[in-house]
Amino acid sequence: MRYGEMEVKNFNPEEIEVWPNRNDRHYTIKITLPEFSCLCPRSGYPDYATVYIEYVPSSLVVELKAIKLYINSFRDRHVSHEDSANEIYDLLYKKLSPKELYLKMDFNPRGNVHTIIEIDSKKN
C-alpha cells in the first residue's frame, strides 16, 4: 500500500485537525474539492461530486490537508448522496462551531440524474 492510500485508510474523522482562528474580523473561507467520490449503496457504481464548503469561522479553522483526507476517505464507502453531504456538514459544524456554514455537493450525472445537495446553517 502506498503512503497516500495508507493516510486515507487510517484517517479518523473525529481527529480532523483544526487550528485557532487568529483573526477577529468576519470573513468567509471557501474551499472547493473537485474530486469527491463514493460508491452507490445500492449498485456499487462510483459516484463523483464537487464539494463546495463556505464558512465564517468563529475560534477555529480546518486544516486543508485534513479536509482533503476526510473527503478522500469516502472513496471506498457505500454511501448515498444525502448521507455523505449530511455527514460532512455535521462533522464540520461539530468540530468548527462556525458562525455560518454552507455545504454544496454537486454530483456528476449518472443514469440521466443530476443531484445537488445543499445545506445552509442560515436556513436550519
From Swiss-Prot:
GO terms for cellular component: cytoplasm. The keyword Endoplasmic reticulum does not apply. It catalyses: 7-aminomethyl-7-carbaguanine + 2 NADP(+) = 7-cyano-7-deazaguanine + 2 NADPH + 3 H(+). GO terms for biological process: queuosine biosynthetic process; tRNA modification. Keywords: Cytoplasm, NADP, Oxidoreductase, Queuosine biosynthesis. It is found in: Cytoplasm. The keyword NADP applies. SUPFAM superfamilies: Tetrahydrobiopterin biosynthesis enzymes-like. Substrate binds at residues 62-64, 81-82. The active site is at 40 (thioimide intermediate), 47 (proton donor). One of its GO terms (molecular function) is preQ1 synthase activity. It holds the Pfam family QueF. Its EC number is 1.7.1.13. InterPro entries: GTP-CH-I_C/QueF (IPR043133), NADPH_dep_7-cyano-7-deazaG_red (IPR050084), QueF (IPR029500), QueF_type1 (IPR016856). It is an enzyme of class 1 (oxidoreductase). Pathway: tRNA modification; tRNA-queuosine biosynthesis. Its main location: cytoplasm. Catalyzes the NADPH-dependent reduction of 7-cyano-7-deazaguanine (preQ0) to 7-aminomethyl-7-deazaguanine (preQ1). Belongs to the GTP cyclohydrolase I family. QueF type 1 subfamily. This is NADPH-dependent 7-cyano-7-deazaguanine reductase. It comes from Wolinella succinogenes (strain ATCC 29543 / DSM 1740 / CCUG 13145 / JCM 31913 / LMG 7466 / NCTC 11488 / FDC 602W). The lineage of its organism: Bacteria, Pseudomonadati, Campylobacterota, Epsilonproteobacteria, Campylobacterales.
